[in-house]
Curated annotation (Swiss-Prot):
InterPro entries: Aldolase_TIM, RibuloseP-bd_barrel, Trp_synthase_alpha_AS, Trp_synthase_suA
A molecular function GO annotation: tryptophan synthase activity
Keywords carried by this UniProt record: Amino-acid biosynthesis, Aromatic amino acid biosynthesis, Lyase, Tryptophan biosynthesis
Record lineage: Bacteria, Bacillati, Bacillota, Bacilli, Bacillales
Protein name: Tryptophan synthase alpha chain
SUPFAM superfamilies attached to this UniProt entry: Ribulose-phoshate binding barrel
Encoding gene per record: trpA
Organism whose genome encodes this protein: Staphylococcus carnosus (strain TM300)
């Protein structure tokens, strides 16, 4: 299996065209952020993008409607929604899951929903095609890692730094051993995210992960750079992932 490239974009007025660019350039799964007024897990870049999307009139309902309208064009791309639980609650759980299914959503990442509540949500909608994606922090105990990993759907998102997303900082010193422990206990790919910016970091991390998530850097580039420049950057990330995979197989 190739290493997974999972970029994140904000659900703004341009998100469908951005999604198509990412799909063109080898994204395996795209995370789409639902804009929220109090995004506690987001760094300043994503927070600013979310505020701007809200000003543009974007919300969960509009994003799901657009995904549904473009579903046939996007059929080769898996996309997941990153959303705070309050958005789902406000929307209505059952209707939200139903609309996600209609829009072709592969899964949900809900950073403020603890594992136990996530399992209850899964149980309530066990016949749904929408996966609840698990997050594991580097501070999690071995027992907790085992429990989360053994119940995981889709993929596991490991948080590489104990901070908000996209801020400068060092990767957790025990990252490799933790990820290998998660992989040993999981039947799904284990990807790393938070704070990843460049091909060098991607090459390092993908030696021992099943893929990487890039958020703030991609949001920043879609806000500021030309499409040509964005595509070149995305190609450099895809290349770094493919070269790591090729080296591992040689």
């Amino acid at each position: 299996m190739s290493k997974l490239f999972i970029p994140y974009i904000m659900g703004n007025k341009d998100f469908i065209s951005n999604l198509k660019v990412l799909s063109d350039e080898g994204a395996d799964i795209v995370e789409i952020g639902l804009p929220f007024s109090d995004p506690v897990a987001d760094g300043p870049t994503i927070m600013e993008a979310g505020n701007k999307a809200i000003e543009e009139g974007m919300n969960a309902r509009k994003i799901l409607q657009e995904l549904k309208a473009h579903k046939d064009e996007l059929k080769d791309t898996k996309y997941v929604l990153m959303t705070y639980y309050n958005i789902i609650l406000h929307y209505g759980e059952e209707q939200f899951i139903k609309d996600c299914e209609a829009a072709g959503v592969y899964g949900l990442i809900i950073p403020d929903l603890p594992f136990e509540l996530g399992e209850q949500l899964k149980e309530r909608f066990k016949d749904s095609s929408v996966k609840i994606i698990s997050l594991i922090a580097m501070t999690a105990s071995d027992d907790r890692i085992q429990k989360i990993a053994q119940h995981a759907d889709g993929f596991i998102y490991t948080v590489t730094m104990n901070a908000t997303t996209g801020e400068n900082g060092q990767f957790h010193p025990e990252l490799q051993s933790k990820i290998e422990y998660i992989q040993k206990n999981a039947d799904v790919p284990v990807v790393a995210g938070f704070g990843i910016r460049n091909p060098e970091q991607v090459s390092t991390l993908s030696e021992f992960t099943d893929g990487i998530v890039i958020g703030s850097e991609i949001v920043k580039r879609f806000a500021n750079d030309s499409e040509t420049s964005i595509r070149q950057y995305l190609q450099s990330i895809r290349r770094a992932l493919d070269e790591t995979k090729a080296a591992a197989n040689s």
